[in-house]
Amino acid sequence: MAEKIATREAYGKALAALADKYPDLVCFDADLAGATMTKFFKAACPERFFDMGIAEADMVGVAAGMSLCGFKPFVNTFAMFAAGRAWEQVRNSVAYPHLNVKVVGSHGGLSVGEDGATHQCIEDFAIMRAIPGMLVLCPCDGNEMRLAVEALVNYEGPAYMRLGRLAVETVTDSIPGYKFELGKGATLRDGTDVTIIAVGMNVQMALAAADLLAADGISARVIDMHTIKPLDRELVLKAAKETSAIVTTEEANVLGGLGAAVAEYLGETYPIPVVRHGVNDEFGRSGKAPLVLDAYGINADGIVAKAKQAIAMKK
């Protein structure tokens, strides 16, 4: 049976496991170590763990300063505060001088659940993607997260990574030939009729949707686009040419995120039907995470409907 683990937990354990290997790695949190799972790094390496309290903007500024001293800071808080409250400091103190700071936003998307709209950050992909030079990613499972963390430690420059609250099935470790590389998507399943490009926990939904489509005689390709920026344009173009219809799916506002990135690129280079699946420009609501996701159609059935819509739009 596949491992089921929240990407936030996989992240916290992976970061802690790298503490000895990378003595310049430092970890910041804003009084949320138990939720963001940086508690594992704190336990493993307390002298390089800094709890800044509920002062996210200050935390980013201090991390920027430490990066100038040769350290590799990972800054942690909820996605709403990382992409929202501290956005100006991320833009001006980290991205503008192109400093080597990694901003990690946990509890992203609708699946925060009961905390409701004020904490359901569905805008972080768009907000962070708009910052020049900012790498933006959201791994889909524990295996991919572990690989992403070390890749980020060795990546020089500013980056934003979203983590999820819910435990999700590990799927990438059973894909033949799977490998992780920043800026490069991974084809998890081949298909000829439509391509589903997914990010984060929507990858698992996309694989389930592909099974449902197969039952209807539709061959769906599934791409795990863990890195939203820079977008793997080569892989997107290949899928566009070979399947002639694309669905993007994300646990985020469809404005400015993965769907926008794919549509912008293909609109200028190889126009085909692109249908975006995600939150349609509205706030979230409070409730059990699975119920909230279903209320917004963020599930396999929602992806199936969008895939059939994209196929119907083919010329």
Could you tell me what each predicted segment is?
Residues 1-162, 167, 302, ...:
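Thiamine diphosphate
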